């Protein structure tokens, strides 16, 4: 059973969306055992008796996982519970060797909280319901004639971040999830690698008529390992539900949409039914008898709160207020901690923050996109980009030449731009004003109509003249000098 994506929607309806974000914490060991918490190793090598649920094995709580959960709670201004406990969530599946998951049901470690995200250029607040600790399941792998289970992931520490049903569009859902990801990376709680499963997102979606109170039956969607797939899946499901209600205007709501779990098939671009939705009763929650409650002191929580690093929103506001970056530039830089850190490092030797931002967000990504790389993955030192911008600022090279130098920097990542410029005669600036004047005179002699148009107030005509001069001198002349000479000579023409 599947549902093809098509464009929604109906103006009388609104979506109600809640997200459950599962985050694998980057602790050295697992949540309840000393087994390594590491992705990509040979199957079933990072396991102990606790991971595989052997009789007599007992869990021991990883205190670093608790600390990271508290860090996140403090980062979103939530209430960190001084008393929380673990529970067993029972279900039967091959990747769960104990036939239950250790999670937190009614007394989670974090309650409430607020996440501020940028949606269409504006800040919007989203409410978090809870954050709880739990251990991960193993991985079921299907082969041609059999299925195998890799328990390396079993027991890895997770926090599940549950939002309130306060999200109403796919764009809001993506913005909220990206803000969560950025916070987690800034506090070093997780690498949030969606391809490796460090960040997994489930969405709960229902629709209702605008102004209607209460919630209708919801659909859960799993298997969204990118933000673009997530946005597509949500759009698809919103449209499906609206069409279902419009097609059956007289039927009771709960007979039109039944609670169920779907998965997103990225190849077919459609949602596929997995199973009818279970209720909390189906999981038979009860307190975990082998673990004592988590009891935290005020001083422990406050110490973690005071040790928080600068968070994405704080850094974004600093970039706009102190550096004069646009809101878009600041958001784009701070959404990726590695990129923001790279920017900060380059700023130590670069005088122009706006120019640096433009090169990091536009010029270099455009050159690296085809190879799926970025400035860090090709080992391009921050000081080299700073050096390139400084060469432009000093007038040593023009912006056009800088782009050619950037091409060589990408091709030879370890080479300093000053060295590249010094070794190529074509990159030497044209400082002879008399020679530049000859180019200007030639362009003016060949483009009388552009002179007439410029005098008539058409700025594009002047830009064309500048471009022609720069073309003749192969981009080596100073644009400001070319501008000055053109204006002087045009003013003196009869």
UniProtKB/Swiss-Prot annotation:
Write out the GO MF terms: asparaginyl-tRNA synthase (glutamine-hydrolyzing) activity; ATP binding; glutaminyl-tRNA synthase (glutamine-hydrolyzing) activity
Record's InterPro entries? Asn/Gln-tRNA_amidoTrfase_suB/E, Asn/Gln-tRNA_Trfase_suB/E_cat, Asn/Gln_amidotransferase, Asn/Gln_tRNA_amidoTrase-B-like, GatB, GatB_C_1, GatB_Yqey_C_2, Gln-tRNA_amidoTrfase_suB_CS
Assembly, in brief, is: Heterotrimer of A, B and C subunits.
This protein's name = Aspartyl/glutamyl-tRNA(Asn/Gln) amidotransferase subunit B
A GO BP entry: translation
Q: Which SMART domains match?
A: GatB_Yqey
Q: Record's family?
A: Belongs to the GatB/GatE family. GatB subfamily.
Annotated SUPFAM superfamilies? GatB/YqeY motif, Glutamine synthetase/guanido kinase
Reaction(s) catalysed by this chain's protein: L-glutamyl-tRNA(Gln) + L-glutamine + ATP + H2O = L-glutaminyl-tRNA(Gln) + L-glutamate + ADP + phosphate + H(+); L-aspartyl-tRNA(Asn) + L-glutamine + ATP + H2O = L-asparaginyl-tRNA(Asn) + L-glutamate + ADP + phosphate + 2 H(+)
Q: Could you say which EC number(s) this protein's record lists?
A: 6.3.5.-
Q: What does this protein do?
A: Allows the formation of correctly charged Asn-tRNA(Asn) or Gln-tRNA(Gln) through the transamidation of misacylated Asp-tRNA(Asn) or Glu-tRNA(Gln) in organisms which lack either or both of asparaginyl-tRNA or glutaminyl-tRNA synthetases. The reaction takes place in the presence of glutamine and ATP through an activated phospho-Asp-tRNA(Asn) or phospho-Glu-tRNA(Gln).
Give the record's keywords alphabetically.
ATP-binding, Ligase, Nucleotide-binding, Protein biosynthesis
Q: Does the keyword tRNA-binding apply?
A: no
According to its UniProt entry, this protein's organism is Protochlamydia amoebophila (strain UWE25)
Source taxon at top rank: Bacteria
Q: Name one Pfam family in it.
A: GatB_Yqey
């Amino acid at each position: 059973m599947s549902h093809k994506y098509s464009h929604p929607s109906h103006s009388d309806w609104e979506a109600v969306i809640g997200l459950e974000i599962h985050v694998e914490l980057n602790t050295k060991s697992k949540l309840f055992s000393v087994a390594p918490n590491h992705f990509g190793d040979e199957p079933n090598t990072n396991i102990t008796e606790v991971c595989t649920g052997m009789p007599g094995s007992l869990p021991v709580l990883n205190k670093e996982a608790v600390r990271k959960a508290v860090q996140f709670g403090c980062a979103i201004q939530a209430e960190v519970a001084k008393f929380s406990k673990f529970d067993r969530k029972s279900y039967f599946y091959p990747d769960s060797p104990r036939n239950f998951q250790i999670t937190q049901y009614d007394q989670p470690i974090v309650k409430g909280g607020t996440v501020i995200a940028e949606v269409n250029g504006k800040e919007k607040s989203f409410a978090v319901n809870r954050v709880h600790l739990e251990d991960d399941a193993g991985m079921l792998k299907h082969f041609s004639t059999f299925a195998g289970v890799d328990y390396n992931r079993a027991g890895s520490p997770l926090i599940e971040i549950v939002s309130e049903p306060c999200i109403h569009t796919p764009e809001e859902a993506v913005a909220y999830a990206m803000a969560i990801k950025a916070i987690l990376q800034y506090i070093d709680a997780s690498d949030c690698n969606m391809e490796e499963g460090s960040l997994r997102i489930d969405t709960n979606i229902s629709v209702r008529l605008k102004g209607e109170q209460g919630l209708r039956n919801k659909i859960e969607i799993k298997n969204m390992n990118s933000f673009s797939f997530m946005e597509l899946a949500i759009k698809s499901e919103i449209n499906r539900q609206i069409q279902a209600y419009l097609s059956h205007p007289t039927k009771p709501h709960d007979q039109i949409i039944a609670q169920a779990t779907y998965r997103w098939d990225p190849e077919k671009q459609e949602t596929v039914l997995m199973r009818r939705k279970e209720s909390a009763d189906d999981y038979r929650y009860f307190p975990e008898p082998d673990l004592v409650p988590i009891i935290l002191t005020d001083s422990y929580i406050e110490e973690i709160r005071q040790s928080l690093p600068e968070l994405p929103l704080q850094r974004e506001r600093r970039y706009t207020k102190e550096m004069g970056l646009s809101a878009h530039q600041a958001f784009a830089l701070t959404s990726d901690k590695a990129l923001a850190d790279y920017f900060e490092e380059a700023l130590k030797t670069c005088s122009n923050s706006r120019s640096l931002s433009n090169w990091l967000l536009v010029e270099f990504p455009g050159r690296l996109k085809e190879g799926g790389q970025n400035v860090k993955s090709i080992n391009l030192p921050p000081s080299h980009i700073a050096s390139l911008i400084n060469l432009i600022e000093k007038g040593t090279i023009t912006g056009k030449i800088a782009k050619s130098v950037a091409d060589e920097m990408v091709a030879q990542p370890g080479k300093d731009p000053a060295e590249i410029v010094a070794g190529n005669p074509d990159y030497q600036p044209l400082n002879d004003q008399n020679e530049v004047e000859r180019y200007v005179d030639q362009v003016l002699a060949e483009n009388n109509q552009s002179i007439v148009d410029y005098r008539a107030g058409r700025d594009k005509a002047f830009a064309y003249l500048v471009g022609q001069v720069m073309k003749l001198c192969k981009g080596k002349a100073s644009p400001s000098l070319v501008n000055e000479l053109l204006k002087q000579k045009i003013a003196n023409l009869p």
